[in-house]
């Protein structure tokens, strides 16, 4: 059909739409006008029955921008135009419905048909091999989904199916756009059953897919897009917040600057307390400054402003009595907002009415001002030491001497609050200013009285001991006071037991007297018997007194001791209290045991009996105290190493843990002086103990402490045993330990630090790495071929990953404090040679391929040892000739061989050049010497003789060349492949021939320095520098 001008309407529609697209790609400025024109064109086309033509040409023109790259601004402008056009049509329909405008079915149908056909048309490119087309298609779908309300169910299913595929596209840019599309299909109600969905469920859920992307996608940008667009509710929030441990810096920072900031006050109520503490700790301790600053800004500005600047309320939300990160959080707040400090005051009336938050704030502000030398705040807000001791004593009396509280639950709550307040005041008191002697004595009295309380909690015991140490005149004074407190507690308990026994005996006597009064007629006989016994006792007493008076007493001292009543012992609970105080005291003592007799007496009376005690808790505390004493005296450590080893071998889990800690500490302090000697424990026995602990995966905590301790001892070169070190590395890669995250984390940090800290450490790794690799290859093969269904085949790393890790650890370029000799280091070459030596022992072709394909990660340099490079080349040639390799392995091995050949040629050329330079230098020196020694005629004679000698040398050289040519001919005739052993035999024979030739030349050189005789006035000159000295001696 044509218009009155004779132009085809279909063509006119194309020209009109094309003109709009042409103008729209130039700038965003006229898009509103272009959208109005497009709407007018569409309405006219529909009126004239050309709806399909408009849709066709619209689709056709949009298709033109699909191959454009991501950075092409023209494509982005057309995409914005399409999104704005569809949004405008949708907006008109919504506005008409709100104004109760009666829409015809045709008006709604036009819009729905246009959107339906356009999305279906665009989806045809979602499987395109061109990454740009896939990107533009999903970009269009993402902006369209933002601007439409409802779509057909069949179209919805088609979209979900397509997006489900594109979320795993190989291009990150495409996956990001797929994430943007999926976020439009999230259903908040579906997240309630997020964890109950199965992977094979046909009804695909967008939220579950986004959760999978946020956890597993390798691209940081894709994870970021999923994190920022995932619904934030109780079910999805843990997956969002775990991005605080993302490997990408930006993702970690956005958790604090976007996610938590957008939650506002909901953070304190919607996030679980332990997760909340972890987020603060991770943010403030992040290795990147930008992440730390984002976390500080969140605490000091966003959260504080959300709470209207109420610092006390912020501390309440942080739950200072429970949380362990509040100290770091409040320090970050003071650093970011120093203006807050000047606004905080502690009036006199508040000191007797501390709350948990105020007590914590007092401690935090005092320590912050002390660390940062803010003396004005210290002088204005904080009392003198004597006043502080009064306040501390006030709360101690409230906690331990207040018995008027009737409500048990309220009493429990008050007790915890008071203990926390006492702890905060004590922490501040440890570093308080005690220049006033009155204040020091007052605080010391309060602290000693507090430590004498038997009901004191362990945290208060610990801080109380530390405060007493800071108040002591010297360490001897501190030990004296601490042991006095321990002895007083024990003596009080024994005295209390004696009093209780006296009371019991008095009650028994009263009962006996009552029973005597109520006796019947048989009582007369009993009275007679009692009278006889009393008479016997009186007579024996008189005889004993008489013997003593007359000096006839024959009673021995042993009899007296045996007749003494047994010594009372403190109760188990009291022993635990004493051991707890002594352990915290010993942690602060540095004086050798030989100079402190009080600790030696404490060993005899408290610690040694505790180690022999059968109660587990007492024995564990006794071993801990014994270990702390061993750190003060090497002889004591030597004497008790066997006991500590037995505790590790035979004790329960907690005793093993403590004993392992003690053994590691003893080695750290005293080194190897405690083993391998007369009366000492054998070091091999201790190594076996560590070996057994590392192999026992039933005690993961003990594995961790053994691994960390061994790594420290190896790092300090206290332990140097290769077998034990090999056990450490094998434990790291063992699949049995893959679930022990603490152990794997300890190894992942300690092993690289050890290898890169010193060349000797890297050499130890190189010596053991080949055997480690072989063992792990065998283990991996057994794991993969296992028929047991419970075996997790993914629990162990593949051999190629392990090989890469070992190469990385033995790379000399990774050493700290590198010197110029790093390029000459052959430690990695030695490891690779060892690997090629054991290559034949590996039976699995798959494992061989894994090793060969990663062999080129080795560091090669022309400055490395020539013989080592030559040996590596020989083993590589041997494998290439005798092993049946696939193309990939062959190419990798050929690359290594080519690199080695080029390096060897370079070394040879450099050696030849250096030899020539040395010869030239030597000739110049000899010429100057000869010129000074002989006249011109003698020099002419010498030159003539030198020519003759050169001719002889030329003949000798030709002979050598002929010999080598014959050898080459022989080698070519025997063209079969030689084994490694045959090649070594041939090399040996060649070396013998060369030696004989060299011997001949040596004889010639030795004879060369002879003065000319009568028959010949010629004399040859040797090339060695040292021969000039011989010549001068002869002259």
Swiss-Prot record:
RNA-binding recorded as keyword: no
Annotated GO CC locations: condensed chromosome; condensin complex; cytoplasm; nucleus
Region of interest (Disordered), ranges: 500-536, 909-934, 959-995, 1012-1035
Major place of residence: nucleus
Biological processes per GO annotation: cell division; chromosome condensation; meiotic chromosome condensation; meiotic chromosome separation; mitotic chromosome condensation; mitotic sister chromatid segregation; negative regulation of meiotic DNA double-strand break formation; rDNA chromatin condensation
GO molecular function: chromatin binding
Amino acid composition bias (Basic and acidic residues), ranges on this chain: 909-919
InterPro entries per record: ARM-like, ARM-type_fold, CND3, Cnd3_C
Cysteines joined through disulfide linkages: none
Matching Pfam families: Cnd3 (PF12719)
Biased composition (Polar residues): 920-934, 959-973, 986-995
Keyword annotations: Cell cycle, Cell division, Chromosome, Cytoplasm, DNA condensation, Mitosis, Nucleus, Phosphoprotein, Repeat
Phosphoserine: residues bearing it: 198, 933, 981, 1008
Assigned protein family: Belongs to the CND3 (condensin subunit 3) family.
Note: Present with 1920 molecules/cell in log phase SD medium.
Record note on quaternary structure: Component of the condensin complex, which contains the SMC2 and SMC4 heterodimer, and three non SMC subunits that probably regulate the complex: BRN1, YCS4 and YCG1/YCS5.
Protein name from the UniProt record: Condensin complex subunit 3
Organism this protein belongs to: Saccharomyces cerevisiae (strain ATCC 204508 / S288c)
Gene: YCG1
